[in-house]
Design a protein with these regions (language model features):
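A short, N-terminal "cap"/entry segment at the start of jelly-roll beta-barrel domains
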Residues: 1-40, 126-138
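Short acidic-glycine-tyrosine-enriched beta hairpin
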Residues: 37, 76-103
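Conserved short histidine dyad/triad with adjacent acidic residue
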Residues: 39-58, 90-96
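Conserved catalytic motifs of the protein kinase core domain
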Residues: 41, 63, 107
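Glycine- and acidic-residue-biased ligand/ion/polar-headgroup-sensing regions
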Residues: 50, 59-78
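Double-stranded beta-helix
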Residues: 102-138
Length: 138
C-alpha cells in the first residue's frame, strides 16, 4: 500500500507580494522555495485569490508553471479569458504579452520556475492600466 502525502498549504510560509508603492499587492501571496544565483533560477509558489485578478504584468524571462491546487486562469489585457490550467497542468513559457492571472472558484496555488534571469534585466514587470511599467522585479 502506498503512503501518499497530501499537499498542505498551511505548512507554506506565505508572504505578501510587494507592489509598486511598497504595500502588498491585492490577491497574491508568495513563498520563495529557492534562489540559485549561480544558475540564475528562482523557484517559488504563488497563491492567487479565488475569482480575483492580480495586477497586469509581463514575464521578461523564460518560466515554467505547475498548478498545484485549484485552477489558474489567465486573462488578456482587455479582460477576456485566455486560458484555464487546472491542478496538475504544467506549462513552459517565454517572455511575452501583458496579462493578468487569478484563481477559479477557489484560491489557486502555482509553482513558478523563472529561468534563467539576468542581473540586469527584470524577471517580470508590473504594468498600470495604460500598460506602462510601474515596477520591475529583479
Amino acid at each position: 500500500m502506498e503512503n501518499l502525502i497530501q499537499f498542505n498549504e498551511s505548512e507554506i510560509d506565505w508572504k505578501p507580494a510587494p507592489g509598486p508603492d511598497g504595500e502588498p499587492l491585492d490577491h497574491v501571496s508568495l513563498s520563495f522555495l529557492n534562489v540559485d544565483e549561480n544558475a540564475k533560477i528562482v523557484d517559488l509558489l504563488f497563491k492567487f485569490s479565488a475569482n480575483e485578478k492580480i495586477q497586469m504584468h509581463r514575464h521578461c524571462s523564460n518560466y515554467s508553471t505547475f498548478t498545484v491546487q485549484g485552477e489558474l486562469k489567465t486573462y488578456y489585457p482587455d479582460g477576456s479569458l485566455k486560458s484555464v490550467r487546472p491542478a496538475g497542468v504544467f506549462k513552459a513559457g517565454t517572455p511575452g504579452e501583458p496579462h493578468t492571472e487569478g484563481g477559479g472558484d477557489e484560491d489557486v496555488i502555482v509553482y513558478f520556475s523563472l529561468r534563467p534571469y539576468t542581473t540586469t534585466d527584470p524577471i517580470y514587470e508590473l504594468l498600470d492600466e495604460n500598460m506602462e511599467v510601474v515596477q520591475m522585479m529583479n
